[in-house]
């Protein structure tokens, strides 16, 4: 704003002149009343046009009278002219005062409007700052959620890798299980062959045991026959002893008779009889010896046959016992191997069941985590939608603030233009009427200009801040939408991977149930 100086040539006596007042524009009236104006005009006119004193006191009274009359007429004319001019000036000053007052009122109203707009801009700035702070907090929250999502994504990648490893292990387990099933079938076939061999061996053992029992019976019979023959030999010996005794008795009797006969017969006959007796005795003895030797030979041959048969039976029993021990040992080994195989198969089955259960638990855990992740994604989508709405509202508010700033700028420009027009009017009034000047202090002018520049700087700074905040919010919104789209894509990929892993786990569970059913079918057959 320009500085307007309207120093009045005359001031009322009660108001001394002020060289440079500090304050607003002086819009007071230069005169309190018409009487004051006339008195001031009279004083000024008398002071300006005071006639010189007469040097001589010898002038006549007529000249004084005419001079006084002419002076009074002149003064009266001058007073009337001055009065007219003062009236004109007074009217102009009143009109200028009214115009200045109206301009001041309009300027005050515009200043009040500018203050209100400045307050609204400040409030909008505070709202924008709070919105920016909220957006920054939300952005930090989204970044933390993004980090959590990244960590969750890494966890899901690890879980997917573990699922792939579990799938690979399950395939290996399936292959090992197929190999173990084939080995079990081969072992079952071998067990069936061994069982058939054991049945054949058991039949052989039964036959051998039957043969051994028969051999034992035959040996017992032979032993009984040998004992019987021994008894018969003893009886024969006893009978032979008895016969010998009877023979001895008869021989003694015969000898006695022979003695008697010898005494009664001649010596030749006696001699012949003795020879005959010797021959007969020798013959009997030889016959008995021959008979006994024959019986002994028969008994010895029978005993030899019995011993030979018993030794052959013993060797056969020994070989059969050795063969039976080998068969029993082989049977025990087969049973031990079958038991170990069953234990190994049961352990493998338990291990496979445990691994399948672990895989199923992991799959269930993965399914639950996938559900939680879906819920988190839905929540993120809802939050993103809410954030989008909040950002849209913030953008609308910022647009409103921008429009308000633009309106404030236009209003400020209009006020500046009005102030310039007012200044030009006052300057024109000052140039037109140099005696009518309105004073404004230098400090007031500097303060007004400083306030004006400060308001311009604040408006420009607020406009730039609002534009920067708007750009930052738009960039953060675009970045958040891009990150959300990336997260949604990653979640969709992870969901597809989890669905594939779950399908594979279901296939593995079905294979496990089939294998379990087959094992349950095989167990009664093994039993």
Swiss-Prot record:
<feature type="coiled-coil region">
    <location>
        <begin position="95"/>
        <end position="159"/>
    </location>
</feature>
<feature type="region of interest" description="Disordered">
    <location>
        <begin position="46"/>
        <end position="70"/>
    </location>
</feature>
<feature type="coiled-coil region">
    <location>
        <begin position="436"/>
        <end position="513"/>
    </location>
</feature>
<keyword id="KW-0175">Coiled coil</keyword>
<dbReference type="InterPro" id="IPR008545">
    <property type="entry name" value="Web"/>
</dbReference>
<feature type="compositionally biased region" description="Low complexity">
    <location>
        <begin position="55"/>
        <end position="68"/>
    </location>
</feature>
<protein>
    <recommendedName>
        <fullName>Putative WEB family protein At4g17210</fullName>
    </recommendedName>
</protein>
<feature type="coiled-coil region">
    <location>
        <begin position="202"/>
        <end position="389"/>
    </location>
</feature>
<feature type="region of interest" description="Disordered">
    <location>
        <begin position="1"/>
        <end position="28"/>
    </location>
</feature>
<comment type="similarity">
    <text>Belongs to the WEB family.</text>
</comment>
<dbReference type="Pfam" id="PF05701">
    <property type="entry name" value="WEMBL"/>
</dbReference>
């Amino acid at each position: 704003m320009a500085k307007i100086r309207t120093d009045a040539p005359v001031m009322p006596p009660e108001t001394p002149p002020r060289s440079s007042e500090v304050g607003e524009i002086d819009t007071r009236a230069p005169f309190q009343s018409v009487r004051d104006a006339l008195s001031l005009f009279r004083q000024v006119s008398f002071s300006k046009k005071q006639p010189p004193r007469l040097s001589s006191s010898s002038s006549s009274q007529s000249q004084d009278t005419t001079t006084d009359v002419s002076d009074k007429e002149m003064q009266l004319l001058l007073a009337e002219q001055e009065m007219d001019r003062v009236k004109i000036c007074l009217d102009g000053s009143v009109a200028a005062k009214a115009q200045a007052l109206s301009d001041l009122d309009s300027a005050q109203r515009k200043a009040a409007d500018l203050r209100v707009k400045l307050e609204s801009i400040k409030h909008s700035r505070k709202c924008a700052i709070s919105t920016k702070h909220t957006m920054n907090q939300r952005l930090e929250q989204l970044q933390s959620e993004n980090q959590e999502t990244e960590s969750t994504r890494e966890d899901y990648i690890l879980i997917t890798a573990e699922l792939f490893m579990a799938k690979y292990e399950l395939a290996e387990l399936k292959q090992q299980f197929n190999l173990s099933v084939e080995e079990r079938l081969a072992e079952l076939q071998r067990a069936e062959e061994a069982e058939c061999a054991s049945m054949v061996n058991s039949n052989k053992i039964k036959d051998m045991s039957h043969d051994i029992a028969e051999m034992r019976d035959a040996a017992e019979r032979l032993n009984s026959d040998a004992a019987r023959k021994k008894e018969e030999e003893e009886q024969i010996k006893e009978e032979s002893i008895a016969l010998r005794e009877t023979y001895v008795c008869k021989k003694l009797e015969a000898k006695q008779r022979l003695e008697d006969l010898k005494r009664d017969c001649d010596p030749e006959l006696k001699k012949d009889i003795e020879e005959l007796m010797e021959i007969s005795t020798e013959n009997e003895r030889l016959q008995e010896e021959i008979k006994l030797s024959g019986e002994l030979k028969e008994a010895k041959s029978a005993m030899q046959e019995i011993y030979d048969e018993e030794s052959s039976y013993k060797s056969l029993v020994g070989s059969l016992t050795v063969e039976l021990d080998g068969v029993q040992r082989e049977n025990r080994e087969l049973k031990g191997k079958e038991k170990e195989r069953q234990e190994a198969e049961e352990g493998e089955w338990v291990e496979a069941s445990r691994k399948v259960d672990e895989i199923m638990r992991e799959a269930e855990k993965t399914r639950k985590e996938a559900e939680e992740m879906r819920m988190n994604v839905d929540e993120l989508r809802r939050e993103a939608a809410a954030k989008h709405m909040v950002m849209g509202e913030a953008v609308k508010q910022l647009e409103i603030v921008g429009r308000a700033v633009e309106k404030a700028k236009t209003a400020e420009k209009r006020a500046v233009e009005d102030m310039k027009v007012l200044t030009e009017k006052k300057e024109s009034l000052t140039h037109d009427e140099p005696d009518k000047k309105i004073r404004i202090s230098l400090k007031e002018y500097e303060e007004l200009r400083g306030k004006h520049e400060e308001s311009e700087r604040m408006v420009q700074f607020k406009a730039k801040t609002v534009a920067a905040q708007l750009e930052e919010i738009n960039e953060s919104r675009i970045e958040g939408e891009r990150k959300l789209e990336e997260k949604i894509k990653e979640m969709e990929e992870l969901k597809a991977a989890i669905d594939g892993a779950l399908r594979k786990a279901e296939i593995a569970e079905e294979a496990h149930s089939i294998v379990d059913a087959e094992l349950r079918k095989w167990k009664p057959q093994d039993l």
